Amino acid sequence: MQPRRVNFHTLGCKLNFSESSTLAREFERGGFVRVAPTAEADICVINSCSVTEHADKKCRNLIRKLHRRNPAAIIAVTGCYAQLKPQEIAAIEGVDIVLSNNDKGALFKRVVELSGKGRAQVYSCETDSLTSFFAAFSSGDRTRAFLKVQDGCDYCCSYCTIHYARGSSRNMPVADLVAEARQIAAGGQKEIVLTGVNTGDFGRTTGERFIDLLRALNEVEGIERYRISSIEPNLLADEIIAFCAASPKFMHHFHIPLQSGSDRILGLMRRRYTTARFAERIAAVRRLMPDAFIGIDVIVGFPGETEADFRTTYDFLAGLEPAFLHIFPFSERPGTPAVDLPGKVPPSVATQRVAELEGLCERLHGAFCARAEGTEDTVLFESTRRDGMMFGFTGSYRRVKVPYDRSKVNAVCRVKLGAMDETHDLLGKILD
């Protein structure tokens, strides 16, 4: 008898990616064979996102596509869209089971208990019941793992549904996360990215601090690199900056959400800082790590954003000179306070503002990468092979390419960095 086949379709953030990887391992332990997302499968698992209306639509389209391709397959949907609108998903033809984020850890059990296709079974819960912590880390990538350290968010920004989809901030104990990091190291991966919904808010459950976690992980043998996936500016404390600057394991790489360079818009968004505070945090990073990679999230087209507000945002970002911008047009989410705000920005205007910031990002990222031409740095090489080249990243997240050498996959090498190409990759020469 052929083993049953399962595939996974992960939408959204790296937190979802870590959870999908953990669910896949459970299916494999249960005798299933994991197949590619494009392959025919007996069970299709979708880990959904709901950060924007586009994410919801993408999930609905994926369900329909999978059902057309595999009409007999069991389709299971979990994640943030499933948490927020379970009945909407259950009504889509082909869906067999919908699980809340609280029930995500029971997905394998629920799926194998299904007797066949029929009316979709829905396991839902209210936001107040989102109290469980589904421990997760990714595996499969030969070089980098994503370790879930925190879940939920207490911030309730006016445009965001994640608090409703993920519940209150909570975490695993430091000791348990250290044990998971050791398990990752035993699997041969060299780099861990710490991920969560509001990663820097770590410790709400256990009374520990994020800096306590960083210090403990720093002692794990076998892991050579850590990156913090994202951290709110008001949580990027001086002691965290100083620790990352001093530790050879924590990369000089920070992803810090701004959302707007207008203090008026930040107030409407219910963010917890001003532009002055944000700029001060960036300056604090650069005082100790002048060459740090700083990525910034920004939303354009928020209700009430005037042309003057956008120009203020543009000029603020240009003055900060980050390495990269993650730019999002505002997406109205039902049930959020932003829905009722006046001054809706036409989509065409938001699209134009996105394009302007993308042009700024292209210039800033190119300038950041070009500054490394002619220098030496360490690079962790990945298994990707394209046009005879292999690729890896420096600690400050510049991508480097060298002629493919299988022996260098998952190795940290000293590299001389040469000229930058049109995609901002740096041509490297391995020195050791």
Report residues per predicted region:
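Terminal RNA-binding accessory module
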Residues: D340-D432
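Conserved SAM/AdoMet-binding glycine-rich loop
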Residues: I75-A76, L84-K85, A186-E307
